[in-house]
Amino acid sequence: MGLKADNWIRKMALEHKMIEPFCEANIGKGVVSYGLSSYGYDIRVGREFKIFTNVNSTVVDPKNFVEENVVDFEGDVCIVPANSFTLARTIEYFKMPDDVLAICLGKSTYARCGIIVNVTPFEPGFEGHITIEISNTTPLPAKIYANEGIAQVLFLQGDEKCDTTYKDKKGKYQAQTGITLPRILK
């Protein structure tokens, strides 16, 4: 399994629409950087957020998630409350090749401010926006800047194709758009 370089990422984005929209340059002046890098792609966070709240005194249950757990927010800057959590989504829409797995790591700019980003792997055959989990681990409110970088995606190509892709197994988050809340197949 090999880590893919910028030339491969560029080709897959431009010729196979693996990343749309695709930013061929790495933009970093005056913003949290985003776009193509040497061995990855820095994704941007969109303007929509779902901020966890205790206003309704609910319990977070991944098997029975209720919308009252979150407050919808749209804007250029999202303030994540102290010791809190928000969901967001990428601006980019991904179409993963059948022999490629992508992993996502938070950007150091945010990590050094106590902002931890979690994204599960993009499985072979997955298509959709990426839902991003953002934790503010500090005792202070923290800003997240929409339309700027939030994490870096690394692409790993397998030595052979898998028997069953995410698309083949009809994954529960396949072709998701916007922010997708937890789902349990029934």
Swiss-Prot record:
Q: Which reaction does it catalyse?
A: dCTP + H2O + H(+) = dUTP + NH4(+)
Q: From the record, give the cysteines joined by S-S bonds.
A: none
A GO MF annotation of the entry reads: nucleotide binding
Metabolic or biological pathway? Pyrimidine metabolism; dUMP biosynthesis; dUMP from dCTP (dUTP route): step 1/2
Recite the UniProt keywords alphabetically: Hydrolase, Nucleotide metabolism, Nucleotide-binding
Q: Which residues bind dCTP?
A: 107-112, 152, 166, 176
The active site of this protein is located at 133
Keyword Nucleotide-binding in annotation: yes
Q: Which GO terms describe its biological process?
A: dUMP biosynthetic process; dUTP biosynthetic process; nucleobase-containing small molecule interconversion
Superkingdom classification of source: Bacteria
Q: What is its EC number?
A: 3.5.4.13
Q: Looking at the keywords, is Hydrolase present?
A: yes
Quaternary state and interactors: Homotrimer.
Family of the protein in this entry: Belongs to the dCTP deaminase family.
Functional description taken from the UniProt entry: Catalyzes the deamination of dCTP to dUTP.
Please give the name of this protein.
Answer: dCTP deaminase
Organism (species): Campylobacter jejuni (strain RM1221)
